[in-house]
Amino acid sequence: MEKVLQGDVLRVGGIAHPVLVVSNQEFNQIMEVIVCPVLDDLSPNAIHPMITVRQQNTEKKTCIACEHLRHLDLKARKYTKLGSVNYSQMMDVCDILIALLEYR
């Protein structure tokens, strides 16, 4: 199985849409990940940031549904890596996740 990193975009068996890995490398080492869906039909807003997914020689703009966090066990599912997002965009997504979970 290919190593999964924070910022990777995966196609996972049994899930209709790609997902962005938001969990950190330490958590990902056990092949369990926390992900957010990558959805083409969303409009960018405060909780749906637009990202650019790098795939080999191409780039695709799409949105992340940050409010739909999921835990996946990659040991139990087939997956392929589609691409990744850059560090700056990953920081933006993590900032949104922190804001969504902030205690007030």
Where in this protein do the model-derived segments appear?
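Conserved functional hotspots at enzyme active or ligand-binding sites that engage polyanionic ligands
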Residues: 1-104
